[in-house]
Design a protein with these regions (language model features):
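Positively charged n-region of N-terminal signal peptides that target proteins for export
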Residues: 1-5, 9
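Exported/periplasmic ABC-transporter solute-binding proteins
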Residues: 22-98, 102-294
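C-terminal motif of bacterial Sec signal peptides marking the signal peptidase cleavage site
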Residues: 16-20
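Hydrophobic helical h-region of N-terminal Sec-dependent signal peptides
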Residues: 10-15
Length: 294
């Protein structure tokens, strides 16, 4: 199946009419005939007419986005319930394949076998992966080759990179994490990393790096606060502007994977994707620090 951008929703979604009655338990995906929705357009004439439920599971990196979208969407459509669980990208896609959820959230591109199973790759936003350092680190810029060397265990002390004589503590996510998968794939070091700590959430990585001298880790750009330093990569800062311009090499899609075409889904699920493509939905995406796909 071809990669789809949510902003380019198939024409069938618009003609199918989201005016609608209750939602079914079907799952969703983008269609093959792409047609862009007009900004802010909605085909649901009365918000109170839409009802039903939407279930999501998957990436912990997408927690802020999923929660923000669920909250704002339920305010717009009070008779729709949106639930989200944060089980990791691979688990989320497995859940949508199994039919136990409507949407599988993945913070990486879908694998070929996942697409072959019928999952559509609906990209709703772009995220930058920031390299985070402990606050005392004097090294503030890293090259791609240096990152590879650090994570493969070849460079072991910050003094080798012009910093203080401090051992490098390599922190990462657990196997199955979308962030880890995206990071290792972007650097082409899958299954070659030597981790001192493998943690099960974005928050845990940031907390570990913030409290550990010499630590380095990776996390979603939107999760970075003032407890850690976000390193520049090859002189390019980790900002939304640089990522959207294609100048920052550690970036990835945020995917809401679904089974079948969007036009085949429940009215509630179709309305959610239309909402994400609207001006209102794009504002929600921006507010959590992500980049829209338009």
């Amino acid at each position: 199946m071809k990669k789809k951008i949510v902003a380019m929703i198939c024409a069938a979604v618009m003609t199918a009419g989201l005016v609608a009655c209750g939602s079914g338990e079907d799952t969703a995906a983008t269609g093959s005939g792409a047609a862009a929705l007009e900004d802010g357009e909605t085909s649901t004439s009365d918000n109170t007419e839409l009802s039903g439920s939407i279930s999501m599971a998957g990436s912990t990196s997408m927690e802020k986005l999923a929660n923000a979208v669920a909250e704002s969407f339920m305010e717009k459509y009070p008779d729709v319930t949106v639930t989200a669980e944060f089980t990791g990208s691979s688990a989320g896609i497995e859940s949508v394949i199994a039919g136990s959820v409507d949407i599988g959230n993945s913070s990486r591109a879908l694998k070929e076998e996942e697409k072959a199973a019928g999952v559509a790759e609906n990209i709703v936003a772009i995220d930058g992966i920031a390299m985070v350092l402990d606050p005392a680190n004097t090294v503030t810029d890293l090259t791609k080759d240096q990152l590879i060397s650090i994570y493969k265990g070849e460079t072991r002390n910050w003094s080798e990179l012009g910093g203080s004589d401090t051992p490098i503590v390599v922190v990462g996510r657990e196997a199955g994490s979308g962030t880890r998968g995206a990071f290792e794939e972007l650097l082409e070091i899958k299954d070659q990393c030597v981790y001192a700590s493998e943690l099960d959430s974005t928050g845990a990585v940031i907390a570990k790096v913030a409290s550990t001298p010499g630590a380095i880790g990776y996390a979603s750009l939107d999760a970075i606060g003032d407890t850690v330093i976000a390193a520049s990569l090859e002189g390019v800062e980790a900002t939304s502007e640089n990522i959207k311009a294609g100048n920052y090499f550690l970036s990835r899609p945020f995917v809401m994977g679904t089974m079948g075409e969007i036009s085949e889904q429940s009215d509630a699920v179709k309305a959610l994707f239309e909402y994400l493509a609207s001006d209102e939905g794009k504002e929600v995406i921006k507010k959590v620090g992500l980049i829209t796909v338009d």
